[in-house]
Structure formats: structure tokens, C-alpha cells
């Protein structure tokens, strides 16, 4: 008779993106202007906004840093649509993706924030690199 001692569970083992994602309340349409996005970012004290297309599907993520080149020219910022700017675009995370795999993808892409979408491309939330790291390390967040 062989006695097996229980194996310690690795921190983060079995976790998915759904376990770690946060809701995202701020979104902007891809046809909105750079000025409008900047107003929302400043007014809500945000670092990023999720961008959605005309059907409501996730188009990407825009940051203040990404808008900076357009904001230097006020006449340009008022006329340039978010869709014409360089911003983070897909592929995006999905809720059933393993959290360890998502962490690797975020590290390779150097992402601090990653949109999470459903199978139709609609925004479900965001994955924050700090939260992923904490959960995988086994720390309570």
C-alpha cells in the first residue's frame, strides 16, 4: 500500500481571466474625437479608455500617452477620430483563458491593461497586470 501525501496547490493554479478581471465603466466610440477622449480621461482622472466600434464591439484601448502627439496641435485634436490614432488593438483576452497564459501574453506585449471580450467581441471588463501578478503569486487582492 502506497501512501500519497497531498501535493501543495500552486498559487494561481486553475484561475481564469474571469477570476481576475475588473469592470470597466468608461468607454468611448471610435468615431469620437481626440479632444473628446482627452476630456473624458481628464474629467474622470483615468489612465485609459476602452474604445468600441459603431456596433459596440471592442476596438481597443486608448491612453493619454497615445493621445499626446495629437493634443500638441489643437486644430488637429478637434478633428481627428480615435479610430485614426495609434492605440492598443486586439487580439483581446477572453474570460475562459487561463490566468497564467494571460500573464505571459501581457508580459510579452508589455500591457498594463488588457480588454476582456466575449465570443462576439463585446467588452466584459479589463485585466490589470498588477492584479494578475498578485493572484498568481497567491496574494489576496
Where are each of the predicted segments found?
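Tandem CBS (Cystathionine beta-synthase) repeat/Bateman regulatory domains
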Residues: 1-141
